[in-house]
UniProtKB/Swiss-Prot annotation:
Keywords on record: Ribonucleoprotein, Ribosomal protein, RNA-binding, rRNA-binding
Organism: Rhodococcus opacus (strain B4)
Keyword Cytoplasm set for record: no
GO molecular function: rRNA binding; structural constituent of ribosome
Domain of life: Bacteria
Family the UniProt entry places it in: Belongs to the bacterial ribosomal protein bL20 family.
Record protein name field: Large ribosomal subunit protein bL20
Functional note: Binds directly to 23S ribosomal RNA and is necessary for the in vitro assembly process of the 50S ribosomal subunit. It is not involved in the protein synthesizing functions of that subunit.
Family annotation (Gene3D superfamilies): 6.10.160.10, Ribosomal protein L20
Name of one Pfam family that matches: Ribosomal_L20
InterPro entries per the UniProt record, alphabetical: Ribosomal_bL20, RIBOSOMAL_L20_CS, Ribosomal_protein_bL20_C
Cellular compartments per GO CC: ribonucleoprotein complex; ribosome
Length: 129
């Protein structure tokens, strides 16, 4: 069987790992074994957090919408319910952007949502009809 020399491939593999881990602290950027292990963890975290980012942004949008809705005397869940009843389809991302950048347009949507809700739902929590 012929002898297989792997020096070039091994050096290329090591160099690529060390180049990818160039920003890490300490041994993790200088020693191949530590760098390889850290690279595995880094890619795992990146994969996980790309998915977590979607939920994080949704939470941020809901928080912004709720704050703006409460400034207009309605809660988040009643606003969403009213928009559904009024058959206004606007996603949370755009609704949050409206709440932050264009308060008048957001107030108009809130008015439409309030009008679509049943009358007893608009009453404050303490005054049930």
């Amino acid at each position: 069987m012929a002898r297989v020399k792997r020096a070039v491939n091994a050096q290329k593999k090591r160099r690529s790992i060390l180049e990818a881990s160039s920003g890490y602290r300490g041994q993790r950027s200088r020693l191949y074994r530590k760098a390889k292990e850290q690279q595995l963890h880094s890619l795992t975290y990146a994969y996980r957090d790309r998915r977590a980012r979607k939920g994080d942004f949704r939470k941020l949008w809901i928080t912004r919408i709720n704050a703006a809705a409460r400034a207009n005397d309605i809660t988040y869940n009643r606003l969403i319910q009213g928009l559904r009843l009024a058959e206004i389809e606007v996603d949370r991302k755009n609704l949050a952007e409206l709440a932050v950048s264009d308060a008048a347009a957001f107030a108009g949507l809130v008015a439409l949502a309030k009008a679509a809700l049943p009358a007893d739902v608009n009453a404050p929590a303490g005054e049930a009809a």
